[in-house]
Amino acid sequence: MKTHSDRKSGLHPRNRHQAPYDFDALCLRTPELRPLVFVNEHGTQTLDFADPAAVKALNKALLALHYGIAHWDLPAGYLCPPIPGRVDYLHRVADLLAESAGCVPTGKGVRVLDIGVGANCIYPLLGAREYGWRFVGSDIDPVSVKAAALLAKSNGLGGQIECRHQGNAKHVFRGIISPQERFALTLCNPPFHGSLDEASKGSERKLGKTVQGQPVLNFGGQKAELWCEGGEAGFLATMIVQSKEFAAQCLWFSSLVSKKENLPAAKKALAQVGARQVRVIDMAQGNKVSRILAWSFLDEVACGQWWQPALRGGV
């Protein structure tokens, strides 16, 4: 039997999802996926990737088979992320950390902050399994914080993943990073759209269909996950300005940037706040192209010195 044949070109070499999905193995590990798999006109096993239930079942199977994450679920209506692309972000920034650490740093001595952890808790779960990193995940949505914490605990990672509620939606880091904390890295997948209407129209274009005249938001998604005032560009600008306050406490700040036209303004903002190093790291999965924007307020020498206490004491 053939399997889904779209090779995920452009993924990081360490990404476990280079090959087509092995639906037989996935269904064996997660039987609930089997009824959702069908053979298309080309004789290839596949899914309806516009069906949120199918994508959710695929995620559960991928996480269980490849990462030993046996318990994964979502509250109704929350964002269901694509696993190959999410783990690719982690592999790319792991290489960034390796530049100053001398090798890809692993273990609980590497602390990572995930801004907007979401109910899916996907970056902490994958990062803990792939690299053994220790995570703090923050979110302005209390339901997401509770759901993410439950996922961490259910998979035996409660001591490695801490979820914190951000009580002030205007703050990105303040109220989350305490005065004595240090993080090797911050992650963020910022809201893409600037309004609910924009998010709905974008989803309608993507799916090319409506249900009873109402746009279908593919894979779910709550307000904080999908849109914020100013959209991606506005969120990036706020995060960049606010990152300066924590310049000495974080080795690298980073964010996904879906719209490449947002990069020039972001780079200008980084120059204005005095970032010493700025990187744009390209990512690709099939036809989907994105990039990571990363910045540090430390020069290369200071970055190298960072790891001396970090790898000793787990700060």
Curated annotation (Swiss-Prot):
Q: Which Pfam families does its entry note?
A: Methyltransf_10
**Which CDD domains does this UniProt record tie to the protein?**
AdoMet_MTases
Molecular function terms, GO-annotated: 23S rRNA (adenine(1618)-N(6))-methyltransferase activity
Keywords of the record: Cytoplasm, Methyltransferase, rRNA processing, S-adenosyl-L-methionine, Transferase
Q: Which GO terms describe its cellular component?
A: cytoplasm
Can you say where in the cell this protein is located? Cytoplasm
Biological process (GO) annotations held by this record are: rRNA base methylation
Catalysed reactions, semicolon-separated:
adenosine(1618) in 23S rRNA + S-adenosyl-L-methionine = N(6)-methyladenosine(1618) in 23S rRNA + S-adenosyl-L-homocysteine + H(+)
Q: What is its EC number?
A: 2.1.1.181
Under SUPFAM superfamilies, the record lists: S-adenosyl-L-methionine-dependent methyltransferases
Tell me the enzyme class. transferase
Q: Does Protein transport show up as a keyword for this record?
A: no
The record describes the protein's role as: Specifically methylates the adenine in position 1618 of 23S rRNA.
Family stated for the protein in its record: Belongs to the methyltransferase superfamily. METTL16/RlmF family.
Q: What is this protein called?
A: Ribosomal RNA large subunit methyltransferase F
State the organism of origin: Aeromonas salmonicida (strain A449)
